[in-house]
Amino acid sequence: MSDKIKDKVDLLGMDRAELTEFFASIGEKPFRAAQVMKWIHQFGVSDFEEMTNISKSLREKLSKTALIRTPKIVSEQRSADGTIKWLLEVDNHNCVEAVFIPEKSRGTLCISSQVGCALECSFCSTGQQGFNRNLENWEIVAQMWVANKALGCKPKEERIISNVVFMGMGEPLLNVKHTFPTARILMDDNAYGLSKRRVTISTAGVVPAIDKIKESLDVSLAISLHAPNNALRDELVPINKKYPLEVLMPALHRYVEGGHSKKHVTVEYVMLDHVNDRLEHAQQLIELLGDLPCKVNLIPFNPFPNTDYKRSSNNAVHRFKDALMEAGVNCTVRRTRGDDIDAACGQLAGKVKDRTKRTLQTVNLDKLHG
């Protein structure tokens, strides 16, 4: 990036308050923030000259002081089932993936929050990639910007992207500095106007940040549980050694009890053959969840290169589901989507390693989530 560009303010990742402050700094009135925000996010404009209801003098001023940075689209892959995966280059070395999953009643965009992941979950392709860095505001919201533009989304028309889930590459709650402001942009009526219940942050269990969601965002929460006891979860989801179940579960109860709206937690549980899919595991899960308002989402494992795990049989999955349902636990089996383009759950980054600057490092989790 040239020094000339470095001196400019990047507007893509700014929320309305930040944009208002920026316009004040260049002698403009507060209403300009909402005006420009609509152009950027609702109309997909990245060139100030296209903002036709803004004076020529202001467009010239913006061109000298600001920019709207967008990522390079390295590839777009379309699955037979309609799923679309974008590989986006956010700098000269790093790529991230975003996935759009169309359904009859909604369209869900799955976005990434980090380049790689520090948590090293043993069944996840991204976890085997290693961790490089957190994504910045603009790099996260750019995934929505790209998808919105690629899908031809327009203001005042029926939403194509109705839901956004932070379930792509990385652990969102180890990057609250950037995921939280991005969530606010997604929910701003001058940007994408999503309701709080249509924005979901998924976590492997970063307990201090779960409490921050309740306090400052009030969006939906999904927990990547995957095991009903500490011994097995230590193996599958290593962050459990730092935040074991006896610490995690009370945090989930605090989440559903806080805020202004009735909440539940989505519990993600990947089904691994002869690892966590037996009826004894189902019974342990029933006891663990207790009276927590939740929905369990059973996820058939999606294989990736060099993994020893296998997908549970359909019979095992449905036995597990039936046991939960009989105990009164709301449970569904996720339909695998996009596996033919490596866009299914757990497959992201499986073929991105060569395009990503891999950094194997010991990560201080406390420092990372701030």
Curated annotation (Swiss-Prot):
The active site is at E97, C345. InterPro entries: Aldolase_TIM, Methyltransferase_A, RlmN_N, RNA_MTrfase_RlmN, rRNA_lsu_MTrfase_RlmN/Cfr, rSAM. One of its GO terms (cellular component) is cytoplasm. This is Dual-specificity RNA methyltransferase RlmN. It comes from the Bacteria. The keyword tRNA processing applies. S-adenosyl-L-methionine binds at G170, E171, S202, S224, L225, H226, N302. It is found in: Cytoplasm. Gene3D superfamilies: 1.10.150.530, Aldolase class I. Reaction proceeds by a ping-pong mechanism involving intermediate methylation of a conserved cysteine residue. GO terms for biological process: rRNA base methylation; tRNA methylation. Signal peptide: none annotated. Binds 1 [4Fe-4S] cluster. The cluster is coordinated with 3 cysteines and an exchangeable S-adenosyl-L-methionine. Its cofactor is [4Fe-4S] cluster. [4Fe-4S] cluster binds at C117, C121, C124.
